[in-house]
Amino acid sequence: MNGNVLLDTTIVVAHFRRDAALTTKLQQAGALYLPLTALGELYYGAYRSQNQAKALAQVHEFFKAVVVLHPGEATADCYGQIKTELAQAGTPIPQNDLWIAALAKEYQLPLAARDDHFKCVQGLNVLNW
C-alpha cells in the first residue's frame, strides 16, 4: 500500500502497543493523516495512563509523523449528512467517530480503523488494519 491514509485512534493505539503487522502497513503507506478528534482521544488516553510521561512522549513523537486534519465548515456538512443517514438507518455510531468519518469523506481518504461501525457509513472506504 502506498496511498494516503486517515488513521483512527484504534490504529494508533495498536501501533503504540507494537503491532508489527500494522507498523509495516504504516511504513508502506503514503502520507499519514490524523483527525484532530483522534489526537484529542490520544491525549486523553495518555493523561489517564499510569505512565503518563511515557504515554505523552509517544503521542508527541507520533504527532511528528502525521498531518493533523482540522474540521471546518465542509466537515460539519459531511457530519450532518452522515449522522442523518445513520439515524434513519438506525445505526448510530459514537460522536467522535462521526467527526472522523466526516473528515475521511471530506478529504476522500481511506480510513484505517478497527471499529466495525465505520462500515455503516455510506461511501466511506474503510481499511480494516
Summary of predicted features, one role per range:
Residues 23-26, 118-123:
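Short loop/helix-cap segments at secondary-structure boundaries that form the rim of catalytic
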Residues 65, 78, 117-120:
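Residue-level recognition of specific faces of alpha-helices
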Residues 11-12, 75, 99-100, 117-118:
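Alpha-helix capping/helix-boundary segments
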Residues 3, 67-112:
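Active-site neighborhoods of divalent-metal-dependent phosphate/nucleic-acid chemistry enzymes
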Residues 1-34, 40, 44-61:
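Short, well-structured N-terminal submotif of metal-dependent ribonuclease cores
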Residues 16-19, 113-117:
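Short, polar loop motifs at secondary-structure junctions
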Residues 8, 34-35, 92-94, 115:
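Histidine- and aromatic-rich ligand-binding microenvironments
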